[in-house]
């Protein structure tokens, strides 16, 4: 059953007059936007000295596989707010974002695994979210020719009867020749 909250979202007006300063302050205080380097800088990304592209410069990382001349790239993604507003498109967007991030490392996306986290499945609205997310994942994987090779489902994720936003976390892997080109997400020099 389509959740009732979506009717209210569809009628939201975006015609608010906001100053640039208010928009700037709200945007850059949002945890979805701010720098997350304090998280990924806490662990050793150079274990066994096989890291080609560690965390920080792209949203995907690569490690070499010494015996093969190849490298394995990986990205993990999900935007729960997008999935809350439109579960099918939000889940598809998570797959596509992972695919783009893997491609940015120079690798070809090969497969995904997922971790599907939802509220109480006895609630028809939660099951509708779950079904819609599965449809989005299926369609995006078909478009990218990336099979789902594993995953898990975690249900009953709620506090005081309020379920979590639909959270279809996607991890994608890709393979590349070690000498292949990768794209940088940052500028190599200042613009003029």
Predicted features, each with a name:
Residues 186-190:
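Hydrophobic topology marker
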Residues 1-182, 192:
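Glycine/proline-enriched, intrinsically flexible loops and inter-domain linkers
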């Amino acid at each position: 059953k389509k959740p009732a909250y979506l009717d209210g979202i569809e009628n939201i007006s975006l015609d608010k007059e906001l100053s640039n300063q208010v928009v700037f302050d709200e945007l850059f205080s949002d945890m979805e936007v701010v720098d997350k380097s304090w998280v990924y800088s806490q662990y050793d990304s150079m274990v066994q000295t096989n890291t080609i592209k560690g965390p920080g410069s792209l949203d995907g990382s690569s490690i070499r596989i010494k015996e093969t001349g190849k490298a394995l790239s990986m990205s993990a993604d999900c935007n729960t707010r997008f999935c809350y507003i439109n579960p099918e498109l939000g889940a598809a967007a998570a797959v596509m974002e992972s695919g783009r991030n893997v491609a940015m490392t120079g690798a070809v996306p090969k497969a995904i695994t997922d971790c599907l986290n939802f509220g109480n499945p006895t609630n028809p609205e939660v099951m509708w979210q779950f079904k819609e997310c599965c449809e989005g994942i299926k369609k995006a994987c078909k478009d990218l020719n990336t099979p789902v090779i594993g995953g898990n489902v975690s249900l009953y994720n709620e506090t005081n009867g309020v379920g979590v936003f639909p959270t279809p976390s996607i991890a994608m892997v890709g393979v590349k020749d070690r000498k292949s080109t990768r794209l940088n997400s940052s500028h190599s020099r200042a613009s003029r």
